[in-house]
Structures are given as structure tokens and as C-alpha cells.
From Swiss-Prot:
Location(s) in or outside the cell: Mitochondrion membrane
Organism name: Aspergillus tubingensis
Enzyme Commission numbers on file: 7.1.1.2
InterPro entries: NADH_UbQ_OxRdtase_chain4L/K, NUOK/Mnh_C1-like
Function comment: Core subunit of the mitochondrial membrane respiratory chain NADH dehydrogenase (Complex I) that is believed to belong to the minimal assembly required for catalysis. Complex I functions in the transfer of electrons from NADH to the respiratory chain. The immediate electron acceptor for the enzyme is believed to be ubiquinone.
GO molecular function: NADH dehydrogenase (ubiquinone) activity
Name of the protein this chain belongs to: NADH-ubiquinone oxidoreductase chain 4L
Organismal lineage: Eukaryota, Fungi, Dikarya, Ascomycota, Pezizomycotina
């Protein structure tokens, strides 16, 4: 349980510190999602409930689809702007 909380905090820290690079922001969001999935799996195993394991598989599937869509948008953004860095004004 502490490991998943630690991973979630690493994801938040990565998201906050890398606000100019979209790829690192996407990776940080994925780390946060996978840490929550890991927490659900640990809770499911401790309560001996298979529903949590099914829900974890669903979360991993949605996270994969989210990554694919995000990277597709990122490719379109790169073609439009020529760079993937975010510039705040």
C-alpha cells in the first residue's frame, strides 16, 4: 500500500516538475493511473474479491487507450507547431 502511494506521489511530482514537456506529463499521468491500479489490486487481494482484479484490468485497458490517443494528438501537435514543448506566456 505504501508503495502505490509512493508511486502516486512520484507521478504528481513528475507532472509538476515537467510542465514544459508533454511526453513526460503523459508518462507521469500513466504512473499515477498505474499506482492506483496497483492499490486496487492489493486491496482486492487482501479482501479476496475478484471484482477489484477485473476493475484493474479495465483500468489498464483504458490507460492504454488514453496513451494511444494522447500520443496521436501529440503527433498532430508536432506537425502543426514543429515542437512538442509547451510555452507559457
Amino acid at each position: 500500500m505504501n508503495f502505490s502511494i509512493f508511486l502516486f506521489l512520484i507521478g504528481i511530482l513528475g507532472f509538476v516538475l515537467n510542465r514544459k514537456n508533454i511526453i513526460l506529463m503523459l508518462i507521469s499521468i500513466e504512473i499515477m493511473l498505474l499506482s492506483i491500479t496497483f492499490l486496487i489490486l492489493i486491496s482486492s487481494l487482501s479482501f479476496d474479491d475478484i471484482l477489484g482484479q477485473t476493475f484493474a484490468v479495465y483500468i489498464i485497458t483504458v490507460a492504454g487507450a488514453e496513451s494511444a490517443i494522447g500520443l496521436g494528438i501529440l503527433v498532430a501537435y508536432y506537425r502543426l507547431r514543429g515542437s512538442i514543448s509547451i510555452q507559457y506566456r
